[in-house]
Amino acid sequence: MKLSDIADNAGARKKRMRVGRGIGSGKGKTSGRGGKGQTARSGVRIKGFEGGQMPMHRRLPKRGFNNIFALDFVEINLDRIQQAIDAKKLDAGSVINAEALVKSGALRRAKDGVRLLGRGEITAKVNIEVHGASKSAIAAVEKAGGTVKLLAPAKDEGEAA
């Protein structure tokens, strides 16, 4: 058997239909696009238009609002902190806070604060300062001999008292 003997199975590759090549082809003149007008032209369709039927975005009611005072916490799991400690990017002896996590590369940014979650295990005795923590995360850190201190979220300067 040679490389030139290898071929596709019969019917595996269908030939492309050449449109606009005479009425005898069955795909001449309008090339299967129907009559004239907007739908015969190329380009972007009208977003959300459903052919005159009431579109989905108008059929469904408005719901909810965006709370401008909502705080956006970055979540980090215990296994990620343990990985950073094992890789010598975090010092288990010093306090682990948002600044230390960003500096070590465990987090990209701290946003409005950090929330500790309990996925994975932590074996190092660590002192963690975060803005929020799950019960399982606190229990796991304390089981390893460490502590979790919860901080108040940082308030904006322009916020009313």
Swiss-Prot record:
Signal peptide: none annotated. It holds the Pfam family Ribosomal_L27A. Coiled coil: none annotated. One of its GO terms (cellular component) is cytosolic large ribosomal subunit. InterPro entries: Ribosomal_uL15 (IPR030878), Ribosomal_uL15/eL18 (IPR021131), Ribosomal_uL15/eL18_sf (IPR036227), Ribosomal_uL15_bac-type (IPR005749), Ribosomal_uL15_CS (IPR001196). Residues 21-37 have a biased composition (Gly residues). Gene3D superfamilies: 3.100.10.10. It comes from the Bacteria. One of its GO terms (molecular function) is rRNA binding. GO terms for biological process: translation. Keywords: Ribonucleoprotein, Ribosomal protein, RNA-binding, rRNA-binding. The keyword RNA-binding applies. Residues 1-43 are annotated as: Disordered. PANTHER family: 50S RIBOSOMAL PROTEIN L15, LARGE RIBOSOMAL SUBUNIT PROTEIN UL15M. Binds to the 23S rRNA. Part of the 50S ribosomal subunit. Belongs to the universal ribosomal protein uL15 family. This is Large ribosomal subunit protein uL15. It comes from Bradyrhizobium sp. (strain BTAi1 / ATCC BAA-1182).
